[in-house]
Amino acid sequence: MKILKLLSIFGIFLGLSLIAFSLYFTFLPLKETSPSTTQSQSNKITEPESTQQEEPVIEDVKQEELKESGWIPNWSFDTGITSVRKNIKILDEVNPVLYTINNDGSLSKRTIPSTSIKELNSLAKDNDIQVIPTVGSNDYTSTTAMFKNSSIYKSNISSIIEEIEKYDFDGIDLDFEQIKSEYKDTFIQYLQELKNELSKKNKILSVTVFAQWDNAEYKTNSETIQVQDLTQIGKIADRVKIMAYDYTEFTSSKPGPIAPIDWIEKVLKYSTARIEKEKIYLGVHLYGYEWVGEKTEALTYTSVKNILDTLSIKNAYNEDVAEGYAKFSCEKGKETCEMYFQTKEGISKRKELANKYEIKGISYWRLGGELDILH
């Protein structure tokens, strides 16, 4: 009896213990989790890893637009100003040929009215166009006189600086087309000293040179080309303008292209290997040559257009050389005339090459009489 009573009490105690144990776990508080952890886990979507490689990101780098400049000859100054007005939106720089070198080596201003110079200067400044006048020399006498004596060329430099300050020009362009080879070192020294003085005034040095395309002996201008060391000039000058025309010269008795496109490419390839690309300007001709027998006549594009219109000549363009070409009977008799000249298509091809070689710009010879060929 006593044993049964004890078992009964033990059973009651065991039952109460199980109930208490169950209630404990029922009301036990859950472990808190941070809201951020909970949200990130609930929103996480597991995606299969892509087996395809990501495409490389290629930046679309826009090439800087070609700068366009043009020379204005002293003998057609007013016509040149008219051309600047007409092409005001495309020009970045103009180079009026205002100066030359006297036989004694001194700087000489060409006969151009001061009012015309001021008119051009004002027009250019109002339209954010740089004015960098040219000092041109086409004979050995003047350059020899200047380079044989350092005091003379130093005086020449001082005169250039004075003129730049007088008219507030943006710099100076040098076009010395006849220099004796013995003055090569002196010429380079002259450039360096001129550059030093221009830099003090924050002005630009531009040097115009003949086209070079190999290391061969050149038939014409060979002595000057020896002096025009592209590598040395390129280190000193801010801009180097290459006269990439007159492949077939005015003096040639046989007709031929003025600047065939394949030759221009050789010139650019040769030049860009020696001069920083951002300094190079490709010279582009805007004129034509007409051969009557063995005689040659230089023509503006206006004259070329008149001939083509008068004779009803159409599609006068040679794709092989990227120039205009026409062959016709001359008015003067039974002789055959041949004419090579610039065209819109030709200019476009030259711009394509300039962009291909990533040079700075192009320079037109010359502004005036080109009609709408630049548009």
Question: What kind of feature is each model-predicted range?
Answer:
Residues 350-375:
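Acidic/aromatic/glycine-rich contiguous surface patches that form carbohydrate-binding/processing clefts
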Residues 71-75, 96-99, 134-138, 175-178, ...:
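Active-site-proximal beta-strand/loop segments in catalytic clefts of secreted hydrolases
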Residues 284-350:
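Glycan-binding loop/region signatures in secreted carbohydrate-active enzymes
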Residues 73-89, 147-165, 221-231, 342-355:
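Short, acidic/polar
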Residues 30-32, 39-154, 158-159:
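Glycan-recognition patch characteristic of GH18 chitinases/ENGases
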Residues 94, 174, 194, 240, ...:
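Conserved, mostly hydrophobic/aromatic
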Residues 1-16, 25-28:
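N-terminal Sec-pathway targeting helices
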Residues 107-112, 180-311:
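Substrate-binding surface in catalytic domains of secreted glycosidases
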